[in-house]
């Protein structure tokens, strides 16, 4: 069975984030980034955020993803935007990063921690703390459970064909605090499959492309299932964006 994020990527969606561009912009506006800033993006996918970072700040980004199959598309995106000199693209495992301690000023990781087990989440966040410089910042963006609901989590996992483990607000805060971070959070309505969110994230033409592809006969079942689930549970699931600062 095809994973939901891979399905949406195949439909033409470029922003595979629960809170879309709104949440990403809040994260980026919460930290000072200059051309000297060293950034690690974990789970970069096709590099949409990496491209935005370089174009906006002219900084260097190391972009990694565990899925080696997506990296050629990442490199194509980087080349198409003529920013190869700013970006290093590598395969990498969030729970076992290959970089020395205190290597980066910023780590950004969107829409990935939700898909990890509790143990894997803890391992990844500890790795982020390790590779961040003192005073560095971790920027994350995930799915928020507004209340504990095991059946809802199971239904979400079935809908997107991925075993996921979103947390409550208290759960997310505890995860980052346990690794020594001081987290600040923002949450709101998910935009991933919301019509207005699709337009905000992809533009009118991009949103139409996603919908048109999703309604092709071979795609209709999964597209409709995901669209219905996320809109039916708009009051049960939010996005959560977290700015977590490592003490100096």
Labelled PLM ranges:
Residues 4-19:
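Class I SAM-dependent methyltransferase Rossmann-like catalytic core
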Residues 40, 46-96:
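Class I SAM-dependent methyltransferase SAM/SAH-binding core
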